[in-house]
Amino acid sequence: MSLPRFQRVNFGPYDNYIPVSELSKKSWNQQHFALLFPKPQRPGTKRRSKPSQIRDNTVSIIDEEQLRGDRRQPLWMYRSLMRISERPSVYLAARRQPLKPTRTVEVDSKAAEIGKKGEDKTTQKDTTDSESELKQGKKDSKKGKDIEKGKEEKLDAKKDSKKGKKDAEKGKDSATESEDEKGGAKKDNKKDKKDSNKGKDSATESEGEKGGTEKDSKKGKKDSKKGKDSAIELQAVKADEKKDEDGKKDANKGDESKDAKKDAKEIKKGKKDKKKPSSTDSDSKDDVKKESKKDATKDAKKVAKKDTEKESADSKKDAKKNAKKDAKKDAKKNAKKDEKKDAKKKGK
């Protein structure tokens, strides 16, 4: 056997050397050729299963990105490199010597403890202050409510006092009115006294006037006689005027009665005229009814005639059809009889 040869196969940027013998090379070439260019199946022969067909010949898919030279780095590598570049090296942090403890640190720690205690105290004070403020607020609210109640009571008391003052003022007004009435009554009494004094004076005057009145009464009697005569004349004139007015009224009444009679006659005539057209309307209605009855009878007669004509025509058509059918039947029967007779004659 010959020495194994090295076959160079290119897979992207890497070079892999695979040792392949000549026999294996020949067999591989034959199988590869048979797969690429299979022989046509001969008639009458069964196809043998080849080992290359039994095996799972999956072709490896080569990515184009892998074949290219510019392969991207994985994400984890990229991230780690970026972190290293940003962050200082761990060795520097490890080699750094720890600082010596100084007094300032102790002082700072004490100050911090004191500050914490002070903060705790301030927080406690704040809480107590807030609680006290809440309590004070509640108390103030209660006080405010009490103050409001007191104000309302004061307002009610003021209202009551105002009402009392108003009532007192009304009482005073009524008292003043009564006093005014008393004063008015006194004034009336004084006026009455003055009137009585005047009456006495008038009585004395009337006594003085009586002598003058007697003279006037004599003159008045004469005047009364003259007035009576004039009154009689006036009564006579009035009686004449009344007679004239009564005559005029009677004349007017007569004219009015005549006019009323004329109007009544005209109204009666109008009613008669109205009754006449109503009678004519009734006559016209009767005529219309008679005409409608006549038309109805005429229409009924026409319809009956049409029906009878149709029935007669149908009966005639049926009779003709039946006659034709009977004639045909008779002709057929006669033809059959003649045929039978002819057949009998021929048989003899």
Curated annotation (Swiss-Prot):
GO terms for biological process: cell differentiation; spermatogenesis. Sequence repeats lie at residues 157-184, 185-212, 213-240. GO terms for cellular component: cytoskeletal calyx; nucleus. Residues 25-347 are annotated as: 31 X 3 AA repeats of K-K-X. It is found in: Cytoplasm, Cytoskeleton, Perinuclear theca, Calyx; Cytoplasm, Cytoskeleton, Perinuclear theca. Residues 157-240 are annotated as: 3 X approximate tandem repeats. Its main location: cytoplasm. InterPro entries: CYLC, Cylicin_N. Residues 35-59, 101-348 are annotated as: Disordered. Residues 103-159, 166-217, 238-267, 276-342 have a biased composition (Basic and acidic residues). Pfam families: Cylicin_N. Keywords: Cytoplasm, Cytoskeleton, Developmental protein, Differentiation, Repeat, Spermatogenesis. Testis. GO terms for molecular function: structural constituent of cytoskeleton. Plays a role in the establishment of normal sperm morphology during spermatogenesis. It is required for acrosome attachment to the nuclear envelope, and proper manchette elongation and disassembly. This is Cylicin-2. It comes from Homo sapiens (Human).
